């Protein structure tokens, strides 16, 4: 997926100083950003023209110390046909030579009042999200108490119905049926809906319902980190399920491992409440509060006491 410069401008509210006509035609194909420091000195051996060029205070100060002729020569060599745009931070003044180089090469000049480091982080975050490789998985992604929970299971098990019940209980729907997941880094997985399914939920016997229209903006979310996976499966006599919570089952999506809990489903069981409890318990474990460990410690202490009493 490529990101147009127009998409970047709209998302980060950047000011377009020059090149409105190039915003849709210029595409950003890499999440890497270039801070052209050495390039300002004329060293272009490892220059990556396909990257978005970000000019901060240091680059700007060095640029402004040059003569007009040298300034134009450097900028003209920086601005190549592969270059999507140049972004100037801190609302720094745009030199005339930058306008000339941009006009000669068809490069857009963008400006932001944000400090360079913050702007760099925002641009990188957005580009990483847009350009990361997506994997589609079947399930329902919910935001439960601020935690992204991916609900999976066999077809007809009641995933969407459970999602609807969770929405009624005050939680937020991220995606139903098809969840597009991508890795932000080696340990962070994010999920979002397919655009055609955004805010929609399918309930057998009812059809497709618009959660945004029925329950309001507070009931939906555009994307969420995936921190826990729940797998719903039919209860079968004799089938072993984790009763202590000390299982370490995981699934791997887009190269990121996510802890998974299997929950048996049978008539009369309030699955949405169980999922709420599972999400809260997982968060408690992340904070260092482990009920299973507490139980095991108490059991060990009780056994030790009984052994002393027997002696």
Swiss-Prot record:
Residue ranges of the region described as Important for the catalytic mechanism of dephosphorylation: 264-269
Location of the active site: 138, 159, 177, 243
Region (Important for the catalytic mechanism of both phosphorylation and dephosphorylation): 201-210
Keyword annotations: ATP-binding, Carbohydrate metabolism, Kinase, Magnesium, Metal-binding, Multifunctional enzyme, Nucleotide-binding, Serine/threonine-protein kinase, Transferase
Entry cofactors: Mg(2+)
Signal peptide: none
Residues annotated to bind ATP: 153-160
First-level EC class: transferase
GO molecular function, one term: ATP binding
Binding site residues for Mg(2+): 160, 202
InterPro entries registered for this protein in UniProt: HPr(Ser)_kin/Pase (IPR003755), Hpr_kin/Pase_C (IPR011104), Hpr_kin/Pase_Hpr_N (IPR011126), P-loop_NTPase (IPR027417), Ser_kin/Pase_Hpr-like_N_sf (IPR028979)
Family, per entry: Belongs to the HPrK/P family.
Designated name of the protein: HPr kinase/phosphorylase
Organism per entry: Streptococcus agalactiae serotype V (strain ATCC BAA-611 / 2603 V/R)
């Amino acid at each position: 997926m490529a990101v147009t410069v127009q998409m970047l401008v709209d998302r980060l509210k950047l000011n377009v100083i020059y090149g409105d006509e190039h915003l849709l035609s210029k595409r950003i194909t890499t999440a890497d950003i270039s801070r052209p420091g050495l390039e300002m000195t004329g060293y272009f051996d490892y220059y990556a023209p396909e990257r978005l060029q970000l000019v901060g205070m240091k680059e700007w100060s060095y640029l402004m110390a040059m003569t007009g002729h040298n300034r134009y020569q450097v900028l003209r060599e920086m601005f190549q046909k592969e270059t999507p745009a140049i972004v100037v931070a801190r609302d720094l003044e745009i030199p005339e030579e930058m306008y000339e180089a941009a006009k000669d090469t068809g490069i857009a000049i963008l400006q932001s009042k944000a400090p360079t480091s913050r702007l760099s982080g925002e641009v990188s975050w957005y580009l990483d999200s847009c350009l990361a490789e997506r994997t589609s998985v079947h399930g329902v992604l919910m935001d439960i108490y601020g935690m992204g929970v991916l609900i999976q299971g066999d077809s007809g098990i009641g995933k969407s119905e459970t999602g609807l019940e969770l929405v009624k209980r005050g939680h937020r729907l991220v995606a139903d049926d098809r969840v597009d997941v991508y890795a932000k880094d080696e340990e962070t997985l994010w999920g979002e809906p397919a655009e055609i399914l955004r805010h929609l939920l399918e309930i057998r016997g009812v059809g497709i319902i618009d959660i945004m229209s029925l329950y309001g903006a507070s009931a939906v979310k555009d994307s969420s980190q995936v921190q826990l996976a729940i797998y719903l499966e039919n209860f079968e006599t004799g089938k072993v399920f984790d009763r202590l919570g000390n299982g370490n089952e995981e699934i791997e999506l887009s190269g990121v491992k996510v802890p998974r809990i299997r929950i048996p489903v049978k008539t009369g069981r309030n699955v949405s409440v169980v999922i709420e409890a599972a999400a809260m318990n997982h968060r408690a474990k992340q904070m260092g509060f482990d009920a299973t460990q507490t139980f095991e410690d108490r059991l060990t202490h009780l056994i030790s006491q009984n052994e002393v009493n027997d002696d």
